[in-house]
Amino acid sequence: MKIDILSLFPGYFDGPLQTSILGRAIKQRLLDVQLTNLRDFGLGKWKQVDDTPFSGGGMLLMAEPVTSAIRSVRKENSKVIYLSPQGALLTAEKSRELAAASHLILLCGHYEGIDERAIESEVDEEISIGDYVLTNGGIAALVLIDAVSRFIPGVLGNQESAERDSLENGLLEGPQYTRPREFEGKEVPEVLLQGDHKAISQWRLEQSERRTYERRPDLYLNYLYKRSIDHKFDEETTTNRDHFKCDKISVVLEVNKLKRAKNFYCKVFGLDAMSCENKFCLPHEGKTIFWLREVQAEKKNIVTLSLSLDCACEEDFCYLLRRWELFGGKLLEKQADEHAVWALAQDLDGHAWIFSWHRMK
């Protein structure tokens, strides 16, 4: 893969690109990284590359030097990426996609940004490495190169590690252990010592799911949502469907205080508390019955529920989420794409609720 970096400070990249895995990949010609100084395309005697914006504020990179620099290295198969906090978030999935490209041109942001006309004319995609602002786009460019290079065959000593690493299946990696078996009174989990590979794989998945739920609810929500999309039945291979009809489903929710839980659900979903007793059904959906069972806190089992809501519009979906928070529940994460909106919430007893609403086509 060839990568051209366009920056005001090409010397910034010398150290990272000459050491460790990236340095070795460049020496082995798995990566061909070239640096271009934007100032070489500056205007006038002083090679001016920036100017004051018409809207006021800090300096901007001018359109002409930027477009000239890009066009000097652009080929027919090039993909131009502007590293910007306004771009789509860099993910493992996006890194894998970019690794399939033959030529990337990375435009590093400087000052307060770049004249929009240069972006509209030359940039194929804007990418961000997170919701924060850096001193220059060179840092972001290095992050992208490092993330992408892992998926280029031969860059890693063991390519399988790229597939197994954290985030590759949408989850954080779980805890890992090495010798000794016991350290300061803490022992390695017994399941890892028994040699049962199936049990170990199951344990690792469970630990990854738990850690992701606790530390990155946004990733956990996306993981569950994508998994629900992937788990579809093949109409042609599914037989005797008529023999497996379900009239009603009952879900038991263990709660600390029955009255408190009942009041919460009734207020959120607009139900009559007097008629609910210790069970309730959601409005317009009578096939699922939620039973509330009062238990002691230490004996309570936490469950995760996923509900696809039939709302008239996205505003109605957001209204439900506001009611959830208003009456004491927690809204942990909310995401959206062109197909759906979904949210991860937590009720008063710690049960996880995944609400989704699919946009009409």
From Swiss-Prot:
Signal sequence interval, chain numbering: none
GO biological process, alphabetically ordered: tRNA N1-guanine methylation
Pfam families: tRNA_m1G_MT
Protein's cellular compartments: Cytoplasm
Gene Ontology cellular component list: cytosol
Keyword presence, tRNA processing: yes
Binding locations of S-adenosyl-L-methionine: 109, 129-134
Catalytic activity as recorded in UniProt: guanosine(37) in tRNA + S-adenosyl-L-methionine = N(1)-methylguanosine(37) in tRNA + S-adenosyl-L-homocysteine + H(+)
Coarse class of the protein's main subcellular location: cytoplasm
Top-level EC class as recorded in UniProt: transferase
Gene Ontology molecular function terms on file: tRNA (guanine(37)-N1)-methyltransferase activity
Catalytic activity, EC: 2.1.1.228
Function: Specifically methylates guanosine-37 in various tRNAs.
PANTHER family per record: TRNA (GUANINE-N(1)-)-METHYLTRANSFERASE
Similarity annotation: Belongs to the RNA methyltransferase TrmD family.
HAMAP family: TrmD
Name under which the protein is recorded: tRNA (guanine-N(1)-)-methyltransferase
